[in-house]
Each structure stands twice: as C-alpha cells, then as structure tokens.
Amino acid sequence: YETADRPEPPVNPAAYGAAGALCGPPRALQAFAAAAMAGKLIGPPMRAEMRKGDPALAHAGLGVWSYEAPLDGCVGPTALVERRGAIGAVEVRLVMAPAIERSLVLFSNRADVPLGEVWAGEGLTHALASAAFCKI
C-alpha cells in the first residue's frame, strides 16, 4: 500500500530487472536460503568471499549485506546475511543466520509499516529476526 487506504498499483517485478533485486514466492526464497546456507549453490571459498561485508561500504558483500547484529534473546551479536528487494511500496527481505541454518523471508506491501534495520536493532525485521533466530 502506498498509504494505509490506497493500494499500490499492480506491477511485474521482472520488468524492473536488477532494480527489483529479489523476487519470487516466499517458499522459493526459503528454499534458496536453505540451499545457499547448505553450500549447494557455491563452494566454501566463494561463499566466504561473498559474505565479506565491508563496514566502510555499509557491510556490503558480493550481492548481499553481511554483518553482526544485536538480536533480542541471543547471547552476543549474531552473524547475518541479508538480501533485499523493493519496487514502489513492495519490499522483500531475506535474512539468513548461517551459523544456525535458519532464515527469515519477509514480504511487505505497506509503506506505512517501516521494516527498520536489523543491524541498528530497530523495526519489524529486527523483532522478527530476534524471534526466529534467538527465541528457539
């Protein structure tokens, strides 16, 4: 939704190419995350290179953001790998915790509901990541 009472017009994410960044049904993204964490997509050396999040570049790695975040309920910071996509008011977040082989797929079509930043310890994504990765 662009606003609480006005829906976003229909879009075809494929028409946006790389601008869409991430699209697909939730189960497909969950399957992708499981395969990525299990090493079925790329080998250990390339996976390690991809996950080298550079703090000088907002923790950007190769096609992902990779960082440690303070999550509620976890002992110490948790290593996370994140991929995002957005077109208009539609947002997608894929957050992976490789050390425990768990992931979170989040879709939102509400511009009035801020997803926040996990690394900053704020917002809906942080709350859901804390529940998914720490309160198990």
Q: Where do the model's predicted regions map?
A:
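Catalytic loop of the DD-peptidase/beta-lactamase superfamily, centered on the K-T-G motif
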Residues: 3-136
